[in-house]
Design a protein with these regions (language model features):
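Intrinsically disordered, low-complexity Ser/Thr- and acidic-rich flexible linkers and loops
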Residues: 89-93
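C-terminal segment of N-terminal export signals and the immediately downstream linker at the start
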Residues: 1-19, 30-36
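Iron-sulfur cluster-binding cysteine motifs and their immediate structural context
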Residues: 15-32, 53-70, 95-114, 129-146
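Flexible gly/pro/ser-rich segments immediately N-terminal to CXXCH heme-c attachment motifs
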Residues: 2-10, 39-50, 84, 116-126
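Histidine/lysine/aspartate-rich catalytic loop segments that bind and position anionic ligands
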Residues: 65-83, 87
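Gly/Gly-Pro-rich "capping" loops immediately C-terminal to redox-active cysteine motifs
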Residues: 31-45, 75-77
Length: 146
């Protein structure tokens, strides 16, 4: 669903945030503008989404619609190899934390030598669990919204 349609359907009822057991759903403030005020969003570094889909079950207007977890598309992970410990030169260190956090390992992300992660953009749902788990600061992997 396009953002414009989502914004027209969302009635700012906060039910999605109340039902979210992971606590990943936050709400925009007025400072973001009246058109998006009080609408839900996810800040992956703070708390990634487990794609439980409970938010879609309680949405009274269909602004959030149920889809299979692997079909969710909130964004895509982008890896900065220059910052990733597994790619560090001259001596890479085994890390793989992002891979182990991924809910779709082997599909959305694979790993190679030294646990070097490889993101598969077509399969990445943008849940942010990899970004949340990244031990490098600033994080070597980030979610880019779509």
């Amino acid at each position: 669903m396009e953002e414009e349609e989502f914004l027209s359907r969302c009635i700012r009822c906060f039910q999605c945030g109340e039902v979210c057991e992971n606590g990943c759903i936050q709400f925009n403030g007025i400072d973001r503008g009246l058109d998006v005020a009080f609408t839900p969003y996810i800040h992956p570094r703070t708390q990634g989404c487990t794609t439980c889909m409970k938010c879609t079950e309680v949405c009274p207007t269909g602004a959030l619609q149920p889809v299979a977890p692997k079909e969710v598309k909130m964004g895509v992970a982008r890896l900065n190899e220059d910052m990733c410990y597994s790619f560090a030169e001259p001596a890479p260190r085994t890390c793989g934390v992002c891979y182990r956090a991924c809910p779709f390992p082997g599909h959305a992300m694979t790993i190679g030598l030294y646990d070097q992660p490889q993101v598969h953009p077509d399969a990445c749902v943008g849940c942010g669990l990899c970004e949340q788990a990244c031990v490098h600061l600033p994080q070597a992997i980030r979610i880019i919204p779509v």
